[in-house]
């Protein structure tokens, strides 16, 4: 699970949600294939596989095969999430902390976009 209460300060003083770099990861990127590279490589592969399964799930005619494909797709999404969480916990991913006005602006913008959708609003 991602701990969104963890914060770090960037070298330029910006507060971010995230963790500091793990000592497991090399300080500088180098030509060696390390833990970070392996996890990022697997994460990218999972993203491509998920896209293929998503397309396939929309085009399957047999209900039984559809059920298998969608179950596999669900499991792949969980695996991708776990990989992302692992990279987050190693300090590979961080996000800026948004102030309430920034959150309000984003919510307002997407609420306005929502009314443009051709789907019924709930």
Question: Where are the regions a protein language model picked out?
Answer:
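Amphipathic alpha-helical hairpins
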Residues: 1-122
